[in-house]
């Protein structure tokens, strides 16, 4: 976001805030309204942000959400195809293990609509193409530490797991570490989401598990900044811009492996 603001330095003045919780973001939104912001690009990932975002919109500020769906009238949004990530991950799992087996799905309730949509795409697709698949859900978080801790417990509770539907590469890295630590060989597929060079390297080097990532470009936030500027210029802008996903696995990972890559 800051890179795009710098690129538009002749057109915009900007402030950049990072938030650790809903209360902090609410205070920052108030600060921006006092400052005189005409547009705000926000990532309101916590519950309870509907009213503060609506207040900003009602005061005449253009608000563009990065990825998160919230119940606010007049908000714009640039998003990855979160539901499509779930759809493509479900298809990948079925392609590798068939239409029966046990799949552990790892939703992340704290991520709001991101997790909800990725899970919806996955569960709807599994019901359609593999209705006999046994899907077990365990909540986790988008960190490798949580992936390791939670999946260590999951492995202890489940003697047979055929595939793992993980929503994020960071979680998947922790899951893979838990599998290695436990010496398990039953798991044949692990998905991920986002895309990063460390995970791409694991995809290439791990030949015992089919590992994939549904790409989710961080450059979308730059497009959110561009959308905000376009709205302020009075240009016609669709309220929602969805960026499609791509599956990366062993068959095409070489196209994405690049130590100098600044996107993934």
Task: Give names to the regions the model predicted.
Residues 114, 125-129, 216-264:
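Hinge/cleft segment of the Venus flytrap/periplasmic-binding protein
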Residues 14-16, 39-43, 62-67, 77-79, ...:
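Structural recognition of the beta-strand scaffold that forms the well-ordered cores
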Residues 16-18, 70-94, 105-109, 137, ...:
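Short beta-strand elements at the ligand-binding edges of bilobed clamshell
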Residues 46-84, 88, 102, 196-208, ...:
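Flexible loop/hinge segments that line or gate small-molecule binding clefts
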Residues 26-34, 38-58, 122, 136, ...:
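Hydrophobic alpha-helical
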Residues 11-34:
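Early extracytoplasmic/lumenal segment of secretory-pathway proteins
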Residues 25, 78-103, 117, 145-148, ...:
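Hydrophobic alpha-helical segments within soluble ligand-binding/sensing domains
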Residues 1-8, 85-89, 113-133, 146, ...:
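Short, solvent-exposed amphipathic alpha-helices that sit
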